[in-house]
Amino acid sequence: MISMFFHLLRAAIGTGPCYRRPLTSDEWRALYRVCVVQGVTVVVFDFVKTLPKSEAPELALLMEWLSAATAVEQTMRRMQITAEEFAEEMEKREIPMVVLKGLAFAQYYKNPLHRECGDLDCYMMGKKEAGDLAALELGGRMEEAGYKHSHLQYKGLTIENHRFFTDFDNTRRGILTERLLGELIREEQTPMGGSKLLCPSANFNALFLLKHAQGHFIDEGIRMRHVLDWALLLKQVQDGIDWPRLLEMLERTRTARFAGVMTAIAVRYLG
């Protein structure tokens, strides 16, 4: 069953053919549950919906899958629209809004709306407090969520407004990681489409993705969505990464071994 899951996922992202054998209703139901748990419901459905009727899931499951995929896409579209509106308001106040994590990594997907995420993470280039105040002026709500970030509520969108990038707990390695990420994010940001949202460089996203996934792995484990983020980043922008510099940073932040494991999994299972 897990083997078939990876066949479907590779076919969905265009890195391999799907081994096509007839699946029972129970097998399809199990595959669907795996996709939901691993955070790739919509990505895999993009391929499943192209299967001929003789190979596709039964209609009841197909409609359930379609409903779940549509709900994710609609949620992500609302998030994108509201985030762009909020970024425009920040731009009027000369507050840059650089997106982190989900919305940034989504740019590496064939359809960015198919990368699932629950809220918007952003970094305002040292103007966090001004951004918090602006959100309140715009009728939103704000609450501090520890030293790392605040939670903003704006027109139904939850925004994590970051003061720091990681839960570094004032450790020597954590302070170094923050400093390196700060250097990278200041070097380059590019507009996302025609919006005022800014996306960090490939160098920043690579280091941040790996540190973020490593944190999840240590705390509660990671899902295939994290590995897929890394695989698609490599597929889309590996030529734009300063590899000698990044590898040095990974060594200094003790992320190199984890990066190697993530890459090995991505290559072996996602092509």
Q: What does each model-found stretch correspond to?
A:
Residues 1-118, 124-271:
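Conserved NTP-donor binding/palm subdomain of two-metal-ion nucleotidyltransferases/polymerases, i.e.
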